[in-house]
């Protein structure tokens, strides 16, 4: 009932079935056909997503480096693509105009074919991604210097406050001047306080000294920016 198949016939039938399937699934990234550059690719930036994007026609350098890149990659399998591109660019610059001329002619022919095949083609370069700005760190600029006023005995006295970021960018001379400024403010405030009390109170010097020692003036060091409360 069942016929016996010959082993040679069975092997030939299997090979005949596998050859078309292999031909459909095989892919060669580098081909010698210049028209392979016109194949459309899917993807790209946001506006080309999901649509077929037409590649630009090859220029003279691309025509020349198409075979040279494969040759360098086979000779140096450990070399990265960026290094291969640098080496190819150096070799291209070393060629003479006579050596480059055949590749320019081939590039012109490919561009003419590209214009005939895609008459409405327009080159649209991809947009470069802009670096994201971070607002976490503020630069040590003049904006970090805060000018405030202190109310002492119904009078406003300006003073300057600097944060830790701007203080690190100042010179030693500026630090010395800024450290001596609060002391001068304290001295002037004391002198004004003594003058105010001496004019408002018509008492003897002994009574005035006793009153000052019993009721010293209060100057908050947080507002004045003093490291230590210094009073002569």
UniProtKB/Swiss-Prot annotation:
One of its GO terms (biological process) is male sex determination. Interacts with CALM, EP300, HDAC3, KPNB1, ZNF208 isoform KRAB-O, PARP1, SLC9A3R2 and WT1. The interaction with EP300 modulates its DNA-binding activity. The interaction with KPNB1 is sensitive to dissociation by Ran in the GTP-bound form. Interaction with PARP1 impaired its DNA-binding activity. It comes from Pusa caspica. Residues 24-53, 196-215 are annotated as: Disordered. It is found in: Nucleus speckle; Cytoplasm; Nucleus. Transcriptional regulator that controls a genetic switch in male development. It is necessary and sufficient for initiating male sex determination by directing the development of supporting cell precursors (pre-Sertoli cells) as Sertoli rather than granulosa cells. Involved in different aspects of gene regulation including promoter activation or repression. Binds to the DNA consensus sequence 5'-[AT]AACAA[AT]-3'. SRY HMG box recognizes DNA by partial intercalation in the minor groove and promotes DNA bending. Also involved in pre-mRNA splicing. Keywords: Activator, Calmodulin-binding, Cytoplasm, Differentiation, DNA-binding, Nucleus, Sexual differentiation, Transcription, Transcription regulation. InterPro entries: HMG_box_dom, HMG_box_dom_sf, SRY, SRY-related_HMG-box_TF-like. One of its GO terms (cellular component) is nuclear speck. PANTHER family: SEX-DETERMINING REGION Y PROTEIN, SOX TRANSCRIPTION FACTOR. The keyword Cytoplasm applies. Residues 54-122 bind DNA. The gene is SRY. GO terms for molecular function: calmodulin binding; DNA-binding transcription activator activity, RNA polymerase II-specific; RNA polymerase II cis-regulatory region sequence-specific DNA binding. Belongs to the SRY family. The keyword DNA-binding applies. This is Sex-determining region Y protein.
């Amino acid at each position: 009932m069942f016929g016996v198949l010959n082993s040679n016939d069975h092997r030939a039938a299997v090979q005949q079935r596998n050859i078309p399937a292999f031909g459909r699934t095989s892919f060669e990234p580098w081909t010698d056909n210049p028209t392979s550059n016109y194949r459309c690719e899917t993807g790209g930036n946001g506006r080309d997503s999901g649509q077929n994007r037409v590649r630009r026609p090859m220029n003279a350098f691309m025509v020349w480096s198409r075979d040279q890149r494969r040759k360098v990659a086979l000779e140096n399998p450990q070399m990265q693509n960026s290094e291969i591109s640098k080496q190819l660019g150096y070799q291209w610059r070393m060629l003479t105009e006579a050596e480059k001329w055949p590749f320019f002619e081939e590039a012109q022919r490919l561009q003419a074919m590209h214009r005939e095949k895609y008459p409405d083609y327009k080159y649209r370069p991809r947009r470069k991604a802009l670096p994201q700005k971070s607002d976490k760190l503020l630069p040590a600029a003049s904006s970090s210097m805060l000018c405030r006023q202190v109310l002492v005995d119904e009078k406003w006295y300006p003073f300057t406050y600097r944060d830790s970021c701007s203080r690190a960018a100042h010179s030693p001379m500026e630090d010395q001047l800024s450290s001596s400024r609060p002391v001068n403010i304290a001295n002037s405030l004391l002198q004004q306080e003594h003058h105010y009390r001496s004019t408002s109170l018509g008492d003897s010097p002994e009574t005035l000294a006793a009153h000052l020692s019993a009721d010293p003036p209060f100057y908050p060091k947080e507002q004045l920016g003093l490291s230590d409360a210094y009073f002569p």
